[in-house]
Amino acid sequence: MKVHGMMILAGAALVAGCSGERPELEKPVAAGDTIRFSAGPCFGVCPSYSLRVTPDGSGLLEPERFTSVPGATRFTVTPAQYRRFRSALAQFRPVAGTVKRISSGENCTRFATDMPGYTIEWTRDERPATRLEFQSGCMDASYGKLRATIAAIPRMLDIDAMVKPSAVR
């Protein structure tokens, strides 16, 4: 009975050690926004992941499906890459502290189903987050530049090899 109890305790300790704590980035020292970008799933083989980049250049990629990294992966960006990322997204940023949603039936007339959704979130200190939610099935011409910017993010941050599925799986 004693051995059985010890095995239960050992198993509980192992499970507690694998509790799946979410990796976090250090709080940035440099002033600026931490930008989170999430690519949601589609009804196909679209890479699904979330990433965060701080103004200090720290990045964290958290894969969900169809990426070439098996788990949370840290990366760094140069100050120029961070500025380019921030500037490319600035034109789509909603009013500070608000959420803007671009989706079928709300502000999109031409919509294709089964496409991934994207979320871009800007946070700084304790201020309320600013968030843009974009359903990429929205094919309105007015959102063409947003679609192109989203498609360029992996190259912009030099993580395209991490978010594309490997050729052999």
Segments (PLM) and residue ranges:
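Short, well-ordered, aromatic-rich surface patches in folded extracellular/luminal domains
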Residues: 5, 18-43, 94-169
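Short, low-complexity, polar/charged sequence segments that are solvent-exposed and flexible
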Residues: 54-58, 72, 80-81, 95-96, ...
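A short, structured loop/turn motif at beta-sheet edges
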Residues: 53-57, 76-86, 122-128
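A short-motif feature that recognizes glycine-rich, charge-decorated loops
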Residues: 61-98
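Sec-dependent bacterial lipoprotein signal peptides
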Residues: 1-16
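N-terminal secretory signal peptides
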Residues: 26, 31-69, 73-74
